[in-house]
A protein has these predicted regions:
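Conserved beta-strand hairpin/beta-sheet module of binuclear metal-dependent hydrolase folds
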Residues: 327-371, 477-495
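N-terminal mature ectodomain segment of secretory-pathway/periplasmic proteins
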Residues: 45-48, 52-150, 186-197
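Bacterial N-terminal signal peptides
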Residues: 13-26
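Active-site metal-binding motif and surrounding structural segment of the metallo-beta-lactamase
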Residues: 362-407, 517-521
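Flexible, processing/modification-adjacent segments and terminal tails
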Residues: 31-41, 119-221, 239-247, 311-315, ...
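Gly/Pro-enriched, hydrophobic low-complexity segments
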Residues: 203-309, 478-483, 490-491, 496-516
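Divalent-metal (often Zn2+) His-rich catalytic cores of metallo-beta-lactamase-fold enzymes
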Residues: 512-548
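Zn-dependent metallo-beta-lactamase
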Residues: 282-349
Length: 548
């Protein structure tokens, strides 16, 4: 069954688009409710202004930037998503008639997950990028990436594939074509807008804008802000995020960036994309990350569709089951792997403590089910959270749902209470807390904040929890230590899913120094990324410590 047959709309073909020209709503103007406008003439004027009917596809080239959503060192005002190396020789081909998009760029290898393009989707514990040239492709419900020119295609998970397909249409021509598709149901309104504080100066004269919203794939509500020149300057929607819920997603384009390509076609050269609200001083959130992608792409080839994007058989056949492997690494201590991110369950006399709730709710529900099978009839009383990167906290709400108390560093507390563990809307991918919210988050025993150290104990078994610093990677990092078992449990400080490094990293040395300062007796290190290994393997990486 195809993407379109599954209820995501009709195939995006030129024939379909021609069948549905913009038409004014056959109602008298006064029959629209107050505040609403007829979207037909607005969309038709915008399409005429930029020559949408004359553009079937486009290839753009330039230099871009990539923001790693959820990988900031800390959550605070004016702290954006971290940016890595530029996306050099960036090329994007968008073929709206076929519903396909190709992106390619050069980026230094060895620093980023191979599966990560930009914005959402950064996952530690996954294979690193090995080659400079990267390609990302989407055709309908299928998406994949290629790490280097001769590499095998690797299928993208459904959440990434859906976002890449949506992104094909979040641009001026894409939006106007999508507005003609069956089920789009355009609606329009208007408002006055002033310039942005701090960017556009002390603007006092507002501009009247029209906003047209459409429905895409029966799921996403997408709106475009159109100015008096009939140019689309902002295209906005929401996308699902395991941590933040319904997440702001938008592209912005200035009037000056539109260039004339001939045949009545105009296309923007400057792209500015937000994943997260572009508002450093909003009151409802702590996190201020927003710049996920952008750049100048001023080499534009209209109606250059390039080769067809054919879905590889391996991608078409790919599945993404949630698999949990379990191993008892010490009496009552269970490693729960089978994914890019692990969890560890520790049995106490009358409760269970779990270290780490990564990725998303689906993963953590499977882990919780495995724990219940391993240790029946005891409550999961505590969830120890190592740090606040998105790929490590996607299951916090799942543990809140089952009644666990979350132990985290005090630097993470305000971000969690304001942005993550809340009653915020989650309409695109409802989770357990949004479907069955607890009576009162404010009165529940949901948090323990750690400053320097914390101990969980039943009188026989102890779990010591320590603040790890300094770190350039993140602030608010915790590690767990089981003294009786001589086990250290840590995240991102020493990973074993890849070949061990030839020389120690700064994070490796911070972990080593922490263990030395605290005089911990360690036999086994249990990373969140990778399998447990003897402490001696870690010391081999650290090397000569006689001078330390």
């Amino acid at each position: 069954m195809s993407f379109w047959e599954k209820g995501h709309g009709q195939p995006f073909t030129a024939w379909t688009l021609l069948l549905l020209p913009f038409a004014g709503t056959p109602l008298l103007a006064q029959e629209f409710p107050p505040g609403y406008l007829d979207p037909g003439p607005i969309l038709a004027a915008a399409a005429e202004a930029i020559g949408t009917d004359n553009l079937r596809c486009v290839t753009i080239t330039g230099t871009g930037y990539a923001g790693a959503v959820g990988q900031q060192r800390l959550n605070d005002k004016n702290v954006d998503w971290p940016r890595g190396d530029p996306l050099a020789n960036y090329t994007r081909t968008m073929n709206w008639a076929a519903g396909t998009m190709q992106e390619a760029f050069d980026r230094p290898p060895g620093k980023n997950p191979a599966s990560w393009k930009y914005g959402q989707g950064w996952l530690g514990g996954t294979p690193l990028q090995l080659n400079s040239r990267q390609r990302f492709l989407v055709n309908g419900e299928f998406a994949w990436h290629l790490d280097g020119p001769d590499s095998a295609p690797v299928a993208a998970p459904p959440r990434d594939a859906a976002l890449w397909q949506l992104d094909l249409w979040i641009n001026p021509h894409g939006f106007l074509k999508a507005a003609r598709l069956p089920g789009a149901n355009p609606r329009a309104t208007w408002r006055w807008e002033l310039g942005e504080m701090g960017r556009d100066g002390p603007t006092t004269t507002p501009e009247k804008m029209t906003i047209v919203s459409i429905t895409m794939f029966g799921k996403y509500r997408v709106d475009a802000t159109i100015n008096k020149e009939n140019l689309l300057q902002r295209i906005h929607t929401w996308i699902p995020d395991p941590v933040l819920g319904d997440m702001n997603f938008e592209h912005e384009f200035t009037n000056a960036s539109y260039v004339d390509l001939g045949d009545g076609i105009r296309f923007p050269t400057g792209w500015h994309s937000h994943q997260g609200w572009d508002d450093n001083y909003q009151m409802q959130s702590i996190n201020a990350g927003h710049n996920g992608f952008g750049g100048t792409f001023d080499r534009i080839q209209p109606n250059e569709c390039r080769d067809p994007v054919t879905v590889p058989d391996s991608v078409r056949a790919a599945t993404f089951p949630v698999h949990v492997e379990t191993e008892e690494i010490a009496e009552g201590v269970y490693w729960l792997g089978g994914s890019s991110h692990n969890s560890v369950a520790v049995e106490f006399e009358d409760f269970i403590a779990v270290v780490e709730a990564p990725l998303d709710e689906q993963r953590n529900l499977a882990v919780i089910e495995a724990i219940v099978q391993l240790i029946p009839d005891k409550p999961i009383r505590f969830l120890v959270n190592t740090h606040q990167h998105n790929d490590h906290i996607g299951g916090l709400r799942t543990y809140m749902h089952i009644g666990a108390t979350i132990i985290t560093h005090r630097l993470n507390y305000t971000f969690y209470t304001r942005d993550v563990l809340n009653y915020g809307q989650r309409t695109l991918e409802p989770d357990m807390v949004s479907l069955w919210p607890p009576t009162e988050l404010a009165e529940g025993y949901f948090y323990e904040q750690v400053a320097e150290n914390y101990v969980l104990s039943d009188g026989e078994r102890n779990m010591n929890i320590y603040y790890v610093h300094p770190l350039g990677h993140v602030d608010g990092m915790l590690m767990a230590y089981l003294p009786n078992e001589q086990i250290v449990i840590e995240a991102d400080l020493f990973d074993t899913h890849l070949p061990l490094p030839a020389t120690a990293t700064d994070a490796n040395r911070s972990l080593y120094n922490q263990v030395q300062r605290l005089k911990l007796d360690v036999a086994t290190i249990v990373p969140i990324h990778g399998h447990p290994v003897p402490w001696s393997d870690f010391l081999d990486v650290i090397g000569d410590t006689s001078a330390e």
